[in-house]
Amino acid sequence: MKRFFLTFIIFFSLVYAYANTIVIQGEIIDKKSGIPLSGVNVSTSNNKAQKTITGLNGSFTLKVESLPVELTINYVGYKTLKYIVNKQNNNTIVIEATVEDLKEVQVNSSLEKNNDILARNIEKNAASISNIVSAKAIELSPDFNVANVIQRISGVTLERTSNGDAQYATLRGMDKRYNYTLVNGIKIPSPDNKNRFIPLDIFPSDMLARLEVTKSLTADMEGDGIGGAINMVMKDAPSVKSFSINTSTGYNSLYIDRQFLSYNKDAVNLKSPFESYSNLYAAKPRDFANGLTKITSNKPAPNFFINSSFGNRIFRKKLGYMVGLSYQNSFRGGDITNYGSSISTSDASNLPVVTGKSDRTFSDQQSRLGVHGKLDYIISEKNKIQWYNAYLDFKNHQIRDTRGVDYSIGYDPSNGNYNVSYSTRFRYTHQNIYNSTVIGDHLLMNSKIKFDWTLAYSKAFNEIPENTTVNTVSTVRNNIENQVSVVTLGGQSVRWEHNTDEDVSGKFNFISTVNLNKGTLEIATGGLYRDKQRANFFNEYDLRPFDDNKAVGQKNNLIKGVDWKDYSEIKFTVYNPYGSTGDPLNYNASEIITAGYLQTKLLKENFQLNTGVRVENTNQGYNLLNPVAGVKNIGEQVYTDVLPSIHLKYLLNENKNLRVSYSRSINRPSFFEIVPYKIINEEFTEMGNPDLKHTVADNFDIRYEIFPKPAEQFLIGIFYKNINNPIETGIVDQGQRSFFTPTNFGIAKNYGLELDITKYFFNFGIKFNYTYTNSSITTSKVYYELNTDPNSSVRNVLKTGSQTRQLNGQAANLANLTFIYKNIKNIIDFQIAAVYTGDKLFAVSRFLNNDTWQSSFVQLDASLEKKVKKATLFIKSNNLLNTPVSLYFKKYNKVNETISGYEKFNNGTLLRKDLNGINIQLGFKFKI
């Protein structure tokens, strides 16, 4: 009874105490900017035990015994404030920085440069429609390169490599060819051997101050971005001395269950025999017998990433510098199931027929090196000059090992009879980009005119030397595999490729501001000149098995275990000793762009009107290094475009905008598309098109924007693009022949909706975006039809028709959801991010209604950080679900049900399934 009575008294006392506790709520903001501050210490003046910390949105809650109560507000870089609270809710407390310039506030402040608040502010005040990812958001995300970062932006889908790495970006359902990439506002060249798009995985994410994606172009921007423009703004010199280092190690789960295959990297010949000697040199077997094809199998070393930066301002803060270094060495790969297919011709059903299955393992060791440095010198209050240099280097050593089963000839699984093929590819890819940019900023005529200029030199390089593939075959009878022998025709191919893309460019802008009644008028004009020179080299040798010591009739029959044990022991003869330097991939290309613009920006109390016109002249040409009879061996295209734009931003109130935009933009043919090449295949000849026209598009946008708090946003918008002369690959009939060639196909339409939401609570935050995209384009295709001529021995004939479909590379539905948790007291940051990509048109087929689709999938990534004094421990993981990426036809053929183990996929025909493993990195960061 006493125990019960005591428990009752304690319980009653607690209830009474709680009932007499008052919970006060408030928000801490910066006096100068009005920005909410997170991590501010709040306590009662007479009882320091009663304390709390403001959350991500600057809010706080605190239990006190009575009102009024005096609070003490402490925050690094700010004056300590005593504040008396008289009410429970809606307490807005303003604190003032201890220094006049908020840029001097130390890193502990939420006003740190390159954070989400700055990113939202840029989006809010931008002249056109854009999305920004800040350096702070990148740092806390699970991403290590720019390609992975950009997938978090609405309207962006990614094209991935065989090892699962994101590489190219598609903006608003427009293929990668329809956007361009900038570094600090300067377009950079491409290392691709045929096209002008940039592989974004070559850029380490830790070098960025922010990533900008502009979706509607203004007149002062280059005009060839129908999808948009990607701008990587690199880190500036800090206002105070700073040093940071970040290192991590990790592993890919793929190699827990299997070995990593590698080869002797030093054995790769960077030059072909043609280049090493002369064009008259006949290559010999000894020129290829260098041990490259000897395979080593083991467990890979852990991944190793490191990046560091150092910067300061010296000479009375006039000279600023920032030097950054990033290096990543990782082991990636893929386990891929691939089904070969053809089109059913015997019954003219045009349904897909599965002809074989191959199991491929990819083993990739890749390294990324990034070095960048930036100097800026403040000559005076009116003059400043900057010099930026960057060198980016990417290397990938890959073995692709394939085992294939033929379903079309000799396939009898019930008796254990079928034919087997083996293929192993040894490939080294090396790409680098160098950029050097000088920028000047000046105020003229008593600061009435702003003048800036830019001079830039950039060079991109790509090489794939001694790309070697070895092919062998065998048979299985009664479930027992017979001896493996080298393929007689095409036993080994060895290929050398390299290309350079070199740019010299300059641009300038004059901006004058005129004060009006209750507003201002900004008038800008400028120009651009770029000279691009591109060189391309390709050479391939065909090696065939031959052992002169064997008996007549057996010299080409080289058997594994008898004549050789590993690939390096196979004896070959060179079938084409002079290589294939006559290949159309040997060409030079040039492009000269001259542009000028006039732009006005009217700013009144509640609206901003940006109008302008840009004129761009293009002179694009090519020169075949090996002349071909009957074609244009030298050609050029010269044209001028007038590109108007108008962007209206109506300010509904301080935190709400309504935007309406129109712009005209273009897309130029890629370098190789206008070269008159011909590549003969079994059924079709691929052909270049010197008469290919450039694409012109009219782009319309409407977006409604709300910025409830400085780091929060709600954006919803629609877009529409009317695309004239879109470039797609299709069938063109010439006489009795059909050619697969890049062609202009009339008019295409592309439209969609984008939604972006960012919301922060006390310790939590949510970022969500969704994009719906649809399009329509009609292109020519071929199909088989039963022959109605009774006198003909041909059962079916090939016809040309047309198909209306969406644009290549487009997914109708995209979504991103990121959940953010921040424990301010214990300095812990956690993120889990999901990316959903709906069914995407992956590749366009020559055949009617037989395009390849990528199935919808979800990728899940996560990151966790814990700060300990000046160091931060972190873990980042990608592809946590090890989500398979599958390709398929939407058609299904019951004939395929006779194949042992083959199943339907999404009521269609499975073509490929990729598994790339889970990547996990553990590391630490240190900043001073």
How does the language model describe each region?
Residues 291-400, 644-646:
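Transmembrane beta-barrel wall of Gram-negative outer-membrane proteins
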